[in-house]
A protein has these predicted regions:
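Class I SAM-dependent methyltransferase SAM/SAH-binding core
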Residues: 64-110
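Conserved class I S-adenosyl-L-methionine
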Residues: 1-50
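A short acidic, Gly/Pro-enriched loop at the edge of an enzyme's catalytic core
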Residues: 112-119
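Class I SAM-dependent methyltransferase "Motif I" SAM/SAH-binding loop
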Residues: 56-58
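SAM-dependent methyltransferase
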Residues: 157-237
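Conserved beta-strand signature within the Rossmann-like core of class I S-adenosyl-L-methionine
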Residues: 150-157
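C-terminal lobe and adjacent flexible extensions of AdoMet/dcAdoMet transferase-like proteins
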Residues: 227-273
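A short glycine-rich, Lys/Arg-flanked "PGG" loop and its adjoining helix->strand segment in the class I
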Residues: 137-149
Length: 273
């Protein structure tokens, strides 16, 4: 399961997947159990106040609306390519909104910003990029150390569908297409290989993304590997207890519905006293 020379890690560098991230999110998220996530974070921010830390801020999909609402927002991400797009979007904002927003290159597992926050959010399964129990514990400890005594921490994970996290001979079928926001060309993507690793609780997928010209010719092809760790709710509760975090709420989606198999794991947490 080693990376082929032409295979990169997801969001590791400039690629079609980073360029279409916002457009793909706008296409996919509304039809999933993650629908309404931005509004959920906006409501919570109205309750907790500032400052807000977004871990895994990516292109600013969540951070920018929060800043537009008047909040001070700090975004961190490990992907320089995604941060470059976020900074480009920030530069196009009204000066007062841009002044409330900053982006930084940082790893959530070793985060050390020297300040605390009223609200910390880790949207879009960002926590699942921590691939071992040790990394998960380090990440939770780092996040807790940045949390104000009365502050809230929100994590969004997928609740694992067991038929997708075990080895299978079925051919991958997930994919889609959209119009590239800059070039106007059609961009297609599909999961072309899966390497589930249940012993290590990993979902490993190769995603192939292509940009198609007006005559049907393939202009660009990117192959990237997405690796995420899945965890059951019972496992997450134990990790929270070990990290000194109390569960305030546990939802199955961003509408506040109860937990359900195969939906979201939306955790609202507070540092224990």
């Amino acid at each position: 399961m080693s990376l082929q020379p032409s295979t990169r890690r997801f969001y590791e560098a400039d690629s079609l997947s980073t360029e279409i991230y916002d457009a793909r999110s706008a296409t996919i998220i509304p039809s999933t159990s993650a629908a309404g996530d931005v509004d959920f974070y906006r409501r919570l921010a109205g309750q907790t106040g500032d400052p807000i830390l977004e871990v895994g801020c990516g292109t600013g999909r969540v951070a920018i609306p929060l800043a537009a609402d008047g909040h001070e927002v700090v975004g961190v991400d490990l992907s320089e390519a995604m941060l470059g797009l976020a900074e480009r979007s920030r530069a196009a904002l009204a000066p007062d909104v841009a002044a409330r927003l900053s982006f930084h290159h940082a790893d959530m597992a070793t985060l050390s910003l020297g300040r605390d926050f009223a609200l910390i959010i880790a949207p879009s399964r960002v926590f699942q990029f921590l691939l071992t129990t040790e990394a998960q514990r380090q990440g939770l400890a780092a996040l807790r150390s940045h949390l104000r005594p009365s502050g809230l921490l929100v994590l969004d994970l997928f609740d694992p569908l067991l038929d997708r996290v075990v080895p299978t001979t079925d051919a991958p079928v997930r994919g889609g297409e959209l119009v590239h926001p800059t070039t106007g060309n059609v961009v297609t993507w599909e999961v072309t290989a899966r390497y589930p690793d249940p012993a290590r609780q990993l979902v490993v997928e190769d995603w192939t993304t292509r940009e198609i010209g007006s005559s049907g010719e393939v202009l660009r092809t990117d192959v990237e590997r997405l690796t995420l760790r899945w965890s059951l709710r019972s496992e997450m509760r134990l990790l929270f207890e070990l990290a000194g975090l109390d569960v305030v709420a546990d939802y199955g989606d961003f509408a506040g519905n109860p937990p359900a198999y195969g939906r979201e794991q939306v955790w609202v947490l507070r540092a224990d006293e």
